[in-house]
Amino acid sequence: LRMSRGLGDVYKRQDFTEYLRAIRKKGYTAFLSVHDDGSHFLNRTDKKILKKCGISKTPTFRQSFLAVIDDGKALYSNTGTEKLSYNCTIDDKQFSLLSQGKYNTIDADCSIKMNNQELTSPAGGMHVIVYNKKKHCLVDSVTFTLWRDRNFIR
């Protein structure tokens, strides 16, 4: 899938906290989904930024987590021990999200699809897909390995 680098310097951001600050810009929608665990290295500052977006409940160890942040505000967020799913339409594009942490199962799963095309990798952690509503395109797909460190995979 071709990505446009229309999010300015967010693509250069390698720290999850700085990345969260950058994706709160107007004109962007960010989709977040946890695979296996995305909480161990989620810090207090990360949680404050998510709270400013309207996400008051963040995942704890191996919980499922989904969020959609549009223009810096949460359109949807959910955390739990069961498999979570959510569907929405942005810019006439269908987005489908799924998160299954490893809290009570050995079968962790994660998916973010746009028009039935998978956008995530099989890596564990916090998956983030960013969509530019002005340019009508995806601008980033990244996984932060918050279960073991604060590294990222593109």
Task: Indicate residue ranges for each PLM-predicted region.
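Short HxH-centered metal-ligating active-site micro-motif
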Residues: K12-T45, V139-R154
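Single conserved hydrophobic/aromatic residue that forms the stacking wall/gate
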Residues: L1-Y11
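Residue-level detector of short, conserved catalytic/binding motifs and their immediate flanks
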Residues: G8-D9, T29, F65, M126
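Divalent-metal-activated hydrolytic enzyme cores
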Residues: K48-V142, W147-R148
